[in-house]
Amino acid sequence: MSTVHEILCKLSLEGDHSTPPSAYGSVKPYTNFDAERDALNIETAVKTKGVDEVTIVNILTNRSNVQRQDIAFAYQRRTKKELPSALKSALSGHLETVILGLLKTPAQYDASELKASMKGLGTDEDSLIEIICSRTNQELQEINRVYKEMYKTDLEKDIISDTSGDFRKLMVALAKGRRAEDGSVIDYELIDQDARELYDAGVKRKGTDVPKWISIMTERSVCHLQKVFERYKSYSPYDMLESIKKEVKGDLENAFLNLVQCIQNKPLYFADRLYDSMKGKGTRDKVLIRIMVSRSEVDMLKIRSEFKRKYGKSLYYYIQQDTKGDYQKALLYLCGGDD
């Protein structure tokens, strides 16, 4: 017998193919879209002496991802060249990184960022953690499919060979994209039981039962875990984030902190990451670019409002202060406005 929860999950999974672009995205489909015209204008911009970056930026940051795929197709038909390689030759630096990122589908983009985080010597754990902790089941399943297509190997295999210990176990469990979907029924008994088990497995005892933490935090739905973390405070003298800092260290600590923040409030999590990428001397452009590109059609409007609420100034203002030239222009278009 199907439970209401299963039926709802099934609906949300089946409906995924036709979901309209998020109402909270800053980049919307362009109304008078004409792929041929855009392709022609980009071709002209690339051929212009010194390259007409402004036109390239104006077009590609003001089209939805699906529309950009159409432009790339039209461009290739016109010129017999691939749009990404034409733009790679024409552009450079951070602007090139933004524009090439915009040409990939969301899953291709995430897959390539994950691959880059594990390539060569040393792992960029920060990027690995951000992507794996913040993507939904559907997104992760699509990333796994595309990763295999692009790199002829499984994402899980690469994670296993690049990480170790409990950190590896946590990343592998999350990367499967198999957590429960949010149901319509709230199970208060299970909420209480999970909260107590998280406490018993950590702060209450000597040493930490990490597998118990991993199973609860990677298997339960987001909605359920939000309530678990609230309930947790009635058992533990520390909240979940403070408990993590007391119990574990290194990459594992970092991963659990990112995960809990994503579960509690994902737009705020990204607002904090954006702020950290721009505060102090120098800009961590990789993080800045990845979030601006990957969230522009998902929840950028929510991220902007959390950013303003917490930091007192707008995300737009920070980007203006921290970047320059056509790179700045591209990021500001993706931001979608000042608050």
Curated annotation (Swiss-Prot):
PTM-bearing positions, type Phosphotyrosine: Y24, Y199
Coiled-coil spans in chain: none
Function: Calcium-regulated membrane-binding protein whose affinity for calcium is greatly enhanced by anionic phospholipids. It binds two calcium ions with high affinity. May be involved in heat-stress response. Inhibits PCSK9-enhanced LDLR degradation, probably reduces PCSK9 protein levels via a translational mechanism but also competes with LDLR for binding with PCSK9. Binds to endosomes damaged by phagocytosis of particulate wear debris and participates in endosomal membrane stabilization, thereby limiting NLRP3 inflammasome activation.
Lineage: Eukaryota, Metazoa, Chordata, Craniata, Vertebrata
Subunit structure and binding partners: Heterotetramer containing 2 light chains of S100A10/p11 and 2 heavy chains of ANXA2/p36. Interacts with ATP1B1. Interacts with DYSF. Interacts with COCH. Interacts (via repeat Annexin 1) with PCSK9 (via the C-terminal domain); the interaction inhibits the degradation of LDLR. Interacts with CEACAM1 (via the cytoplasmic domain); this interaction is regulated by phosphorylation of CEACAM1. Interacts with APPL2 and APPL1; targets APPL2 to endosomes and acting in parallel to RAB5A. Interacts with S100A4. May interact with UBAP2.
Positions of modified residues (N-acetylserine): S2
Additional detail: It may cross-link plasma membrane phospholipids with actin and the cytoskeleton and be involved with exocytosis.
Chain positions of cross-link Glycyl lysine isopeptide (Lys-Gly) (interchain with G-Cter in SUMO1): K49
Protein name stated in the entry: Annexin A2
Statement: the UniProt record of this protein carries the keyword Secreted: yes
